[in-house]
A protein has these predicted regions:
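Bacterial signal peptide processing site
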Residues: 27-29
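C-terminal motif of bacterial Sec signal peptides marking the signal peptidase cleavage site
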Residues: 22-25
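Sequence/structural signature of beta-propeller domains
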Residues: 31-33
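A residue-level marker of the well-folded mature domains of exported/periplasmic proteins
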Residues: 36, 40-219
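Sec-dependent signal peptide hydrophobic core
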Residues: 13-18
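N-terminal secretory signal peptides that target proteins for export/translocation
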Residues: 1-5
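N-terminal export leaders
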Residues: 6-10
Length: 219
């Protein structure tokens, strides 16, 4: 092969290589893989409505006794649960047909938990509970219940017993006196506890009781 032919073959091979490279360079570029779609973000759960709680009080909130203690409990609930609850109260609700009206109004206002804080609300509350299955009722010192109505009480008899022990030790006549409110089971129980406490240290003690038939009736 002559030198001229060799040079021509080298040129042809070089041109072929350049052409091949050019064809590769002009080919369609590979597209990058699309980025994955962001995961859907769940909408925040709606804030639950606060529990509405109502209290029916037999006396004024400033009576310094039974109603005052209940209202302190109501305030403690607000402090403990914050915006999860909304509380309200009606004071000086008589133990009569008016109690049913007040408690029924409370249920109608959307309260889901209602406290009747005196013995005389038992029958009115039972009537309202029967008509409001979606509401929970709590009755103080009573003994009747329903599917959505329960009772609660305090251990006042314990303090009454200790007061009796002190009175039994101090008496010189062996006759003790109790000025009592209304003869309901809770009050009778406290008088009995007082007497038993006194008799535990002085078996000769007797207790005389005077009923005023009022919960709150200052002069």
């Amino acid at each position: 092969m002559t030198d001229l032919k060799k040079r021509n073959l080298i040129k042809i091979a070089a041109l072929s290589a350049v052409a091949s490279a050019a064809l590769v360079g002009c080919g369609k570029k590979e597209e990058p893989a699309p980025a994955p779609a962001p995961a859907p973000v769940a909408a925040p759960a709606p804030k639950p409505e606060p529990l509405k709680i109502a209290f029916a009080y037999v006396g004024p909130v400033g009576d310094g006794g039974w109603t005052f203690a209940h209202d302190n409990g109501r305030k403690a609930v607000e402090q403990e649960f914050g915006d999860k609850v909304v509380t309200s109260f009606v004071e000086k609700v008589p133990e009569s047909a008016d109690a049913e009206r007040v408690i029924r109004d409370m249920a109608g206002q959307g309260n889901k938990l209602i406290f009747g804080t005196t013995f005389g609300y038992m029958e009115p509350m039972l009537k309202v509970a029967a008509d409001n299955a979606g509401v929970k009722f709590e009755h103080a010192t009573g003994y009747k219940t329903a599917e959505n109505m329960r009772t609660y009480d305090s251990r006042t008899y314990e303090g009454a017993y200790m007061a009796g022990v002190i009175a039994g030790k101090m008496t010189k006549s062996n006759t003790l006196g109790v000025v009592a409110s209304i003869p309901i089971p809770e009050v009778v129980r406290n008088i009995n506890s007082f007497t038993l406490g006194a008799q535990s240290v002085n078996p000769k003690v007797k207790t005389k009781v005077v009923w005023v038939n009022e919960w709150f009736n200052p002069p």
